[in-house]
Curated annotation (Swiss-Prot):
Organism: Acidiphilium cryptum (strain JF-5)
Lineage: Bacteria, Pseudomonadati, Pseudomonadota, Alphaproteobacteria, Acetobacterales
This enzyme's EC code(s): 2.1.1.192
Needed co-factor(s): [4Fe-4S] cluster
Top-rank lineage group of the source organism: Bacteria
Domain Radical SAM core: 134-374
Note on cofactor: Binds 1 [4Fe-4S] cluster. The cluster is coordinated with 3 cysteines and an exchangeable S-adenosyl-L-methionine.
Misc: Reaction proceeds by a ping-pong mechanism involving intermediate methylation of a conserved cysteine residue.
Protein's name according to its UniProt entry: Dual-specificity RNA methyltransferase RlmN
Biological processes, Gene Ontology terms: rRNA base methylation; tRNA methylation
Length: 390
């Protein structure tokens, strides 16, 4: 694939088709419960209307249910006050409003909170809430897959083999369960402050390798009559699944974060093996094409600082050359160690020198403060299975 291949190139279309076909091999289980009821969480508006039609109800019932499920956050049909009791009973017989099970709940000394969510097939993922230390708001870091195929050398999740993709219900369910934990229902209106104010798709898995379910979940989250989180409050992070980046930009228009982490193919091939399929030139070209990128909506380049690997002044200068002309900022992430990791965090001096070179070129280069390290909730530390676990 050429570095300057246009988004409509037949090669990109073929690559997208292959990615979606592979995703189907790791499809999540159906939304049918063991007792035969269907989970309504994760259904689109159209699917919800179809479910109502199947039981002989009018389309407006779907609108009512949408409000109760995604705006009010109820999990019991009995709480739906504007629906007649006989219909509530009928709905309860046929359907459920699910949440993942909270299998573990850890609170860091810095108030970062990590939950292990277990699903009906007993698979599990970790989800993290990162509160803003200066304001009553914070980000929810969502997972998109159980495990990961990318095997990034510095990432704990990469040591957990991919089991399956998450469904739209399981992705949006993580956010809804976090809202349950913080009592943030009904959905705040307009500019009303939210504790859970942003979503970052930076948890376990590669979102663009589970694009259909991620996109469906984010469309539910962005619906103004439900959870109502605007697209500018959502950031999708990718390690560089180039063929899907154009589609995500066109269909979702959310903020883009790119896990770059190296400025030469020789280094990135080792620490981000996906680079062997989509190299740095192709990745940067896709960033230049990304719809809506502007000074107001900058692409974030994520760069984990690894001692002696990617943290030299020459690396910083090469980074500036690579992203020249792209509306961007660079998040510098001190490496967060995890059990069995072989890398070391760059020194404070090395990080400062690197940041200064990037900033002198006109790019913001904040150094991310590690959050939740004491509960293995920091960037690159998530993993839902431990060695020897069933």
């Amino acid at each position: 694939m050429r570095a300057d291949a246009p988004a409509t190139d037949g090669l990109d279309e073929a690559a997208r088709a292959r990615i979606l076909a592979k995703a189907a091999l790791f499809a999540p289980p159906s939304n049918e419960l063991a007792d035969g009821r269907r989970d309504l969480v994760g259904l689109s508006r159209e699917e919800l209307a179809a479910a109502m039609a199947e039981i002989g109800e009018q389309p407006f019932r779907a609108k009512q249910l949408w409000h109760w499920i995604y705006h009010q956050g109820v999990t019991d049909f009995a709480a739906m006050a504007n629906i007649a009791k006989p219909l509530r009973a009928k709905l309860a017989e046929r359907f459920a409003i699910g949440r993942p099970e909270v299998a573990a709940d850890h609170l860091s000394a810095d108030e970062t909170r990590k939950m292990l969510f277990r699903f009906r097939d007993h698979e599990a993922v970790e989800t993290v809430y990162i509160p803003d230390v200066t304001e009553d708001r914070g980000a929810v870091c969502l997972s998109s897959q159980v495990g990961c195929t990318l095997s990034c050398r510095f990432c704990h999740t990469g040591t957990q083999r991919l089991t399956r993709n998450l469904s739209a219900a399981e992705i949006v369910g993580q956010f809804m369960a976090m809202r349950d934990a913080y009592g943030e229902w009904p959905s705040p209106k307009g500019e009303t402050p939210r504790l859970l104010s942003t979503i970052v798709l930076m948890g376990m898995g590669e979102p663009l390798y589970n694009y259909e379910n991620v996109a469906k979940a984010m469309k539910i989250v962005m619906d103004g009559e439900g959870i109502g989180l605007s697209r500018r409050r959502i950031t999708l992070s990718t390690s560089g699944v180039v063929p899907m980046m154009d589609r995500a930009g066109a269909e979702l228009g959310v903020n883009l974060a790119v896990s770059l982490h190296a400025v030469t193919d020789d280094v990135r091939d080792v620490i981000v093996p996906l680079n062997r399929k989509y190299n740095i030139a192709e990745l940067i070209a896709a960033c230049r094409r990304y719809p809506g990128a502007s000074n107001a909506r900058r692409i974030t380049f994520e760069y984990v600082m690894l001692k002696g690997i990617n943290d030299s002044e020459a690396d910083a200068r090469r980074l500036v050359e690579l992203i020249d002309g792209i509306p961007a900022k660079v998040n510098l992430i001190p490496f967060n160690p995890w059990p069995g990791s072989t890398y070391e965090t760059s020194s404070g001096n090395a990080i400062r020198r690197f940041a200064n070179i990037v900033m002198d070129a006109g790019y913001a280069a904040p150094v991310r403060t590690p959050r939740g390290q004491d509960i293995l909730a920091a960037c690159g530390q998530l993993k839902s299975k431990v060695a020897g676990a069933a």
